Swiss-Prot record:
UniProt-recorded name of the protein: Sulfur carrier protein FdhD
Annotated gene: fdhD
Active-site residues per Swiss-Prot or TrEMBL entry: 115 (cysteine persulfide intermediate)
Family in the record: Belongs to the FdhD family.
Pfam families named in the record: FdhD-NarQ (PF02634)
Record localization: Cytoplasm
PANTHER family for this protein: FORMATE DEHYDROGENASE, SULFUR CARRIER PROTEIN FDHD
An individual GO BP term: Mo-molybdopterin cofactor biosynthetic process
Domain of life: Bacteria
GO cellular component, one term: cytoplasm
Amino acid sequence: MGRVTERRKVIRIRDGAVSTRPDTLVAEEPLEIRLNGKPLAITMRTPGDDFALAAGFLVSEGVLAEQRDLQNIVYCAGATVDGSNTYNVVDVKTAPGVRIPDITLERNVYTTSSCGLCGKASLDAVRTTARWPIADTPPVRVTPELLADLPDRLRASQRVFDRTGGLHAAALFTEDGELVDVREDVGRHNAVDKLVGRALQNADLPLSRSVLLVSGRASFELAQKAVMAGIPVLAAVSAPSSLAVDLAAETGLTLVGFLRGSSMNVYAGADRVALRAAVGQG
């Protein structure tokens, strides 16, 4: 628990000079997520906020949607031969009456730090019905100026990145640009799960007046996680994938990419971005 960084000795070469020095690395360890005692998924993550990560993952799977859906989450002892607790296995127990989607029951997958969708049988299988449809969320409007300010604020909040240079991050902002929460992880999808899981634990779902900002690209999976949490605006500092754009268009999600300086691309849901000039075709 809390094993966020590790120190390792490295050989540094700079301007032809060679030296040996310690370096701080981001920790990466497997986390097995069990659902009601049954193995469900393994993800490579940065230790910390494991319960929130597991809860957020299950929100994106359509298992959890409200705080009352969750009974408890515990670390599992006995995961090793000597029976010790490695803090790398968690068991999520749902509240009585919570229906587990068939797709979740059929899954037993390995997800990497960058792709949580590895192991999905098909694209159609992950188009789960959201409990909080984006189209039903209250009207949210953000300005390009507000969006342009968010990446620098996210970067300023990345404390572990400052020590390692090796972490992704995700942040929740209000529609007025107030920073609500920031999570870091070796995987973008884990960082988002930690945000969403914490919101579920605090009974803050749906996040219907929120803007989600992610470092790096916006994949289909990240768009799905935003939709399942009821987040109306997803912004990324890099490019979205074609499937992310398709999902955003289908669900009404506002998707912004290449958010750098005062420049950005709006790929879907432009009605939530307060544009002052008419959009031309070029």
